[in-house]
């Protein structure tokens, strides 16, 4: 039974999946939006929303969790000082997934993930 089992495997082992989500979240913080396949976009939304929730609290433990996932202090600073304050009065829904069509080569559904504000 699959009770309370959530998340997508994305055709990867655990380490590769975590590395993929970290890379996509770094690119989201740097560029403000990322274009990828739809399943990856949906997982990135979950991952990035949790990072913003931690960044909003500004407690030491939460900042260290964000740094653990992003791996770069400059990105943590950008997330906590520029991005998180935009969502001070909002509880969740920090990112938006917009479907953009299908990839030409293999027909995979693609989507753009961007900040909602």
From Swiss-Prot:
GO terms for cellular component: cytosolic large ribosomal subunit. GO terms for biological process: translation. Keywords: Ribonucleoprotein, Ribosomal protein. It comes from the Bacteria. GO terms for molecular function: structural constituent of ribosome. NCBIfam families: L17 (TIGR00059). Belongs to the bacterial ribosomal protein bL17 family. HAMAP family: Ribosomal_bL17. Part of the 50S ribosomal subunit. Contacts protein L32. This is Large ribosomal subunit protein bL17. It comes from Coprothermobacter proteolyticus (strain ATCC 35245 / DSM 5265 / OCM 4 / BT).
């Amino acid at each position: 039974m699959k009770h309370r089992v959530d998340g997508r495997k994305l055709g990867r082992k655990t380490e590769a999946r975590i590395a993929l989500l970290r890379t996509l979240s770094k690119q989201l913080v740097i560029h403000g939006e990322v274009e990828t396949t739809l399943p990856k976009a949906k997982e990135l939304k979950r991952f990035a929303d949790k990072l913003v929730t931690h960044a909003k609290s500004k407690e030491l433990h939460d900042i260290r969790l964000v740094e653990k996932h992003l791996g770069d202090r400059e990105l943590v600073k950008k997330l906590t000082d520029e991005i998180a304050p935009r969502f001070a009065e909002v509880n969740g829904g920090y990112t938006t997934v917009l479907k953009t069509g299908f990839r030409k080569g293999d027909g995979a559904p693609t989507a753009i993930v961007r900040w909602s504000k």
